[in-house]
């Protein structure tokens, strides 16, 4: 989802 690009959200790289 769009949240995946934010820190701490999956694809953001962070948990």
Curated annotation (Swiss-Prot):
UniProt catalytic activity: N(6)-[(R)-dihydrolipoyl]-L-lysyl-[protein] + acetyl-CoA = N(6)-[(R)-S(8)-acetyldihydrolipoyl]-L-lysyl-[protein] + CoA
Cofactor section: (R)-lipoate
Organism domain of life: Eukaryota
Enzyme class: transferase
Major site of localization recorded for this protein: mitochondrion
The keyword RNA-binding is annotated on this UniProt entry: no
Role according to the record: The pyruvate dehydrogenase complex catalyzes the overall conversion of pyruvate to acetyl-CoA and CO(2). It contains multiple copies of three enzymatic components: pyruvate dehydrogenase (E1), dihydrolipoamide acetyltransferase (E2) and lipoamide dehydrogenase (E3).
Assembly notes: Forms a 60-polypeptide structural core.
Protein name: 55 kDa dihydrolipoyllysine-residue acetyltransferase component of pyruvate dehydrogenase complex
Organism: Solanum tuberosum
